[in-house]
Every structure is written in C-alpha cells, then in structure tokens.
Amino acid sequence: MVQIGFIGAGKVGTLLGRYFRSKSFEVVGYYSHRMEDSQQSAILTDSRAFSEAASLVAACEWVFLTVGDDGLSEVWQRIRPHLRVGQVIFHCSGAKSLAVFTNVPAGVETCSLHPLLAIDSGNQSLDAIKQAAFTVELAMPDSLILKQLSGLGNPLAVIEGAQKIRYHAACVFFSNLVIGLVENGTTLFEACGLPKDFTATAWQPLFLTNARNLVENGPQAALTGPVERNDLSTVTDHLEALPNDQVALYGVLSRFLLQIAQQKHPEIDYSDMERILQNEENGYDTAKAETTRK
C-alpha cells in the first residue's frame, strides 16, 4: 500500500488525508510550519505529526504539497534535495501546472490532483468529496498513478498543464462568482426597500430550486425567465432600472442565456432580444436609465 504524507495541514490536506484513509490508503502524517496544525490533522487521520519536512519526505512514497499556490515553489525547493527514486510529488492547485516543479530529480515523478469541490473545513463530511470529480496533470503520459488514483472511485480526467489556468477560471465561475451574484441580488433587494432579515433568506428557495433543476436536468431544461420567453419589454426595463455598474454584468450573462434559449427554442425569433443585448454591449443608454430612475 502506498504511504502518503502531506506538507501543509490546512483544510485541503486534512480533508484529502481523511478521504484517502477512508479508501484504505495509508496516511503516514503531516508537516506544517505550525505544529498544532500538524497535530490536529494527525489526530483526524490517526497518523503522525512531523516536526521536519525532510522527515516526512523520508517516510513517504507519495508526498502532497497542500499549501497555497504562492508557496508551492518555496516548499518544492526545500524538499527537492531530500527526494529519492520512486517517489511521487503532488500538488493540489487548480491553477498551477507542474511547471512549478523545476529541476525534478531523476526517478522522481510529479503530478497534480485537483478536487472540483469547495472545501470549507478539513473536518467537513466526506459525503461531498466521495462524489467530487478530480482533474489530474501527469508528467508522464504512461504513468501508473492514474490507475492507482482510480481506486478512489471518483470521476477522473487528465488535463494538460497549458489549460490549467483557464480550467481554474471555469471552476471560479461554478463556485466563487456565484457568491458574488448572490451578494449582488441581495443588495438589489435591499435597494428595493425590503427588510434585511427578509433579504437574508428570501432568495434561498429560488436559488436552491433552480440549482437543483440545473444539476438534475441540464441548462436548457432549467432555463426560465424573460430571455427565454423573449420578453423584450421586461429585459429593456431591467437594463433601465439597474445601476450603471450592473448593466454590463446583466448583459453579459443574458447573452449566454440567449444562446441557450436559441438552442432550446429554434422556432422563436430572438433577433430583437439579440439586438437589445448587443446594444447594451456597445454602450447602453445609461443617461436614459438615470432619467428613468429619477
């Protein structure tokens, strides 16, 4: 059984360690610059807390660098002199490629393993990560690592290093930017004079029902609203009512919805809707919008 260690005892390293252990991989332990963090992660994985990174490296076959993106190169340079033939060094960054591993010693393999999952705690339930997909970047196309990782039972896909940053941007659209959209919506609710205690939760059934429909049935089936219905006056009124800094955001996202609507309803002529949204892209009449709001 492969012996696994983690340099970095934060939420990602801790959750992965717990998950690997639940799948009968041998987790040897953790090293972190804060011994308390190493000890806490070791407790959660029934493993060891190491006081030196070199000692952890010596005890493991697979070493995961579960540190922030900006710290990867520094940690790599620290452990590189201690590596030996047959070891595999992983990072878990969605944005960084294997290029961060410079001057790889002969006989050492490198790999990245990125879970498509929002991890908020190392102690969170394993239910979500059991369903999560992972992307893998391999230094060696014929590597046996992919076969070994398939033992986790998760969906796996190989990604080229040159595509990592665009891939990570896509992940941000699926996760982080959604939070920004929700914040934007609640701000608009409050601007309408709705009470804060109402706006804090009123959007949740709408959001969750829509998200569930999207996941279960796909974008075309889930799409509703004025763009799909080709409600020209409603979309125009939206653009006039929104603050200037939100008009562009509404327009960009609506053009994506328009593409889906056109695929869903090829019998509908959306040319006027396209014109309205195209006009917004080329500079919506914000002076008119200001007059309307007054």
Which sequence ranges carry the predicted segments?
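Interdomain hinge/lid region at the active-site interface
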Residues: R212-D269
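NAD(P)+-binding Rossmann beta1-loop-alpha1 motif at the extreme N-terminus of oxidoreductases
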Residues: M1-S55
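Rossmann-like NAD(P)(H) cofactor-binding subdomain of soluble oxidoreductases
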Residues: T45-Q124
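Short, hydrophobic beta-strand segments that form beta-sheet elements in well-ordered domains
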Residues: V28-S32, I89-C92, F134-E137
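Short, polar loop motifs at secondary-structure junctions
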Residues: H33-D37, G94-S97, A139-D142
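Internal alpha-helical scaffold of NAD(P)-dependent oxidoreductase catalytic cores
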Residues: E26, Q40-L44, N103, E109, ...
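NAD(P)-dependent dehydrogenase/reductase Rossmann-like domain
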Residues: I260-A261, H265-K294
